[in-house]
Amino acid sequence: MQTQVLFEHPLNEKMRTWLRIEFLIQQLTVNLPIVDHAGALHFFRNVSELLDVFERGEVRTELLKELDRQQRKLQTWIGVPGVDQSRIEALIQQLKAAGSVLISAPRIGQFLREDRLIALVRQRLSIPGGCCSFDLPTLHIWLHLPQAQRDSQVETWIASLNPLTQALTMVLDLIRQSAPFRKQTSLNGFYQDNGGDADLLRLNLSLDSQLYPQISGHKSRFAIRFMPLDSENGQVPERLNFELACC
């Protein structure tokens, strides 16, 4: 049984966007294969939200900058005694390859944006009950196509995101691994510290405490307030131990 809960909190806008994209891409595959209306709406709603996120910022530009930054960080370890040089070289080559694929790919989300079925469903998602069969006969008949035909189309849609997914996964993995967890203690439910130009906070908290963190701040300074899940009867101990990584 799980005894700890991992919380992550972005300390800047680019990280906030990346975590949202990662979450939405993960949600695309949760209910696959699509076998009914509920599964279809879950899928198309996440596709729609992904496209909304893509339209708000320069996702590709920020990712390419980060891929380059991670390469420069790794290059500082070349020739350092005790460091696995083959591993460093392999990571640098993987980052370069991910960048090349991303920069040559079509506009992120364009393939999904131009799909007729996705466009029709997106138009109805904001309307309460707007995806009934009489509102969306196209979706209704799509759900009655052979399963293999639907699966193939869904795989094609998801594959169109592969250049983004590959680059984002590499970047987030390297950022998450960039700092170890350290034991910390809050006093009366409060903890604050300097971020040291971190992009991401990762916090491990015992499930037994039934507390959750409210985090505020930015890359240079942050504060954590621990709150009880039971807002009426829950209590926050005077001293609370937890693990924190500033990545």
From Swiss-Prot:
Task: Identify the gene encoding this protein.
Answer: zapD
Q: Which HAMAP family match?
A: ZapD
Q: What does this protein do?
A: Cell division factor that enhances FtsZ-ring assembly. Directly interacts with FtsZ and promotes bundling of FtsZ protofilaments, with a reduction in FtsZ GTPase activity.
Compartments where found: Cytoplasm
The organism's taxonomy opens as: Bacteria, Pseudomonadati, Pseudomonadota, Gammaproteobacteria, Enterobacterales
**Family, as annotated:** Belongs to the ZapD family.
A Gene Ontology cellular-component term = cell division site
- Any one of the GO BP annotations: FtsZ-dependent cytokinesis
The cross-references to Pfam families, in alphabetical order and at most eight, read: ZapD
Keyword set includes Cell division: yes
Q: Which NCBIfam families match?
A: PRK05287.1-1, PRK05287.1-3
Q: How does it assemble?
A: Interacts with FtsZ.
Q: Which domain of life, per UniProt?
A: Bacteria
Q: Which UniProt keywords apply?
A: Cell cycle, Cell division, Cytoplasm, Septation
Q: Which InterPro entries match?
A: ZapD, ZapD_C, ZapD_sf
Coarse class of the primary localization is cytoplasm
Protein name per UniProt: Cell division protein ZapD
